[in-house]
C-alpha cells in the first residue's frame, strides 16, 4: 500500500515509524514532515490545510490510505475532501471533529449523553463571563472554546487569576479561539489519557497514558503542549477504563451517530479520576503529542492494521495485542519554551544513539541546515524508550537524553514520577 501521513511533529514521526514496520506498507510519504522523519520516509512540501491540494497529491501519487495527524486539518474538513474523492482516510469529518474544535459543542454532547464531566457555563460576552467568575470564585477553569494548539486552558487558583484569564481571552490572546469561552468547575483528582479507535459504530480501546503538562520538575511552572508521557497509566485501572467506556465514550459515540455525524478515527479522552470515578476533562480528535510516541512504541507494526480497520469499518473483528511492557518519552525543548525561545541552535550526538524497538528519538521541531541538525521549534525531540518496567523505560530514556549534546535544550528530569513514587 502507498500511505500518506499528514503532519510534521513528533506524533507524526512516531506514526511513520510504526507504519514502516508493517509489511503492508510499500511506500510512505509524510507531508510536510521534518528532518527526523526525512531519515525514514519521503517528505513532501504540501499545504495540509487545503483539502483540494491534498486530494490532487493523493491522485498523482496513487495513495491508498491517508492518516491525518494534527487536529487543524481535521477541523478544516480535509478528511471530508479525501473521502469525497474516494480515498480511505483515518480521521474524523469536520462535523465530528467539533468534539475538539469546540468546547461548548463537547459539553452539549456530554449533556445529551449524560456523560460525567465538570459543571460549566458558556459565554460569548466578556462582561457576563467576568461577572460569572467573580460570583463563582476560584479555583476555576477557563477554556477558549476553539482550537488553541493545546494551550487555551487556564486553571485559575485565585479570583484575580480567573478574572485576568477571562480578560485575556476576550481581548484576543488566543485569537478567534477565545471569542467564545467555556468556564468550568475545578475538578480534583489525577488526570490520565484514554485512547480508543472508532469506526463510526464500534469502539476499540488501544491504550492509556499520562502526560506532564507543566514545564518544570514537580509539575511546576506554566502549562505546555506536554513535556513527557508514559504508558500505561496505572491510575486508569481496567475497572475505571470500563467505567469510562460505558459512561462516557460509548454514550458520546452513540449521540454522535444519532446526530448523523458518526465518529471515525482515534478519540483521546482526557479523564479526571477521583475515588475510582472517571469524569471527562476534554476530548481530542487525534493522538496526543507526546502520548502518541509511547503508544506507538508499545503497539509497533499492529498500529497500522488498527488504524486501517477503523477507517475501513472493521473494528468489530479487530483486537489489540498488548505486551506487558511500559514506554516513556522525555521531551527536549528549546530554552525559554513555552515562552520565546531561540531557533537554529545545533543538536549533536543523535547519530550515536540506538534506534530500535526499545529506543527511539522522535523529532518534533528539527531541520537539517548545511548538514547540521538544528532546532526550529519549542518542543524539539521526544526521547522514547520501552522496558519491562516503567523504571527500566525511564532509565533507558534518560540515558539517551544524557548523550545528546544540545546546550540550548532542556528537559524535565522526573517524567513518570506519579507512577514511580
Each model region followed by its residue ranges:
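ATP-binding N-terminal substructure of ATP-dependent carboxylate-amine bond-forming enzymes
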Residues: 1-94
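Short acidic-hydrophobic, aromatic-tinged amphipathic segments that line or gate anion-handling sites
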Residues: 43-49, 121-125, 156
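A conserved helix-loop-beta module that forms one wall/lid of the active-site cleft
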Residues: 90-152
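Internal nucleotide-binding/catalytic subdomain
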Residues: 152-292
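Active-site "cap" helix and flanking loop/linker of ATP-utilizing ligase/carboxylase catalytic domains
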Residues: 245-267, 284-356
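Generic long, charged, amphipathic alpha-helical segments
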Residues: 343-382
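Generic C-terminus detector
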Residues: 366-370, 374-421
